[in-house]
């Protein structure tokens, strides 16, 4: 999942499960204001999910947890080798968000179900895109 922030530049935000990504978007500012902590990958609540357990790289990259004060989500920092590097990139990118030019996108990967698609379609973002290669007959 990615957030495209401004000036046509796409910033990779690594990987969320579809469920956590929708939760993240549902309170974007709350989560972005939360403190990023790191956990041992074996402590991930998603470690047995097919999209995580099937990844041969699992356990070799940092896993972060964010809280908005009510709920927590996990972020898989696939492209970083250390917690320090992941934190530095995360904090730098948060500072660069242009809220006036925010575009959010979602796709049908990482455990996406019709429930997550329905929630995404209802999110109040002015600019959003959903990429899919499937038919979603129950969605209008």
Q: Could you describe each region identified by the protein language model?
A:
Residues 132-140:
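Polybasic, proline/glycine-rich intrinsically disordered low-complexity segments
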């Amino acid at each position: 999942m990615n957030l495209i922030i401004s000036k046509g530049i796409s910033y990779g935000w690594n990987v969320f499960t579809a469920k956590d990504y929708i939760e993240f978007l549902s309170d974007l500012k709350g989560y972005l204001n939360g403190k990023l902590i790191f956990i041992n990958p074996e402590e991930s609540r998603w470690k047995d999910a097919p999209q995580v357990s099937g990844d041969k790289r699992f356990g070799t990259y940092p896993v972060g947890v964010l809280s908005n004060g009510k709920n927590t989500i996990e972020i898989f920092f696939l492209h970083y080798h250390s917690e320090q590097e992941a934190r530095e990139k995360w904090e730098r990118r948060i500072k660069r968000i242009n809220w006036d030019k925010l575009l959010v996108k979602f796709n049908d990967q990482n455990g996406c179900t019709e429930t997550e698609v329905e929630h995404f379609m209802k999110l109040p973002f002015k600019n959003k895109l959903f990429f899919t290669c499937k038919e979603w007959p129950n969605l209008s």
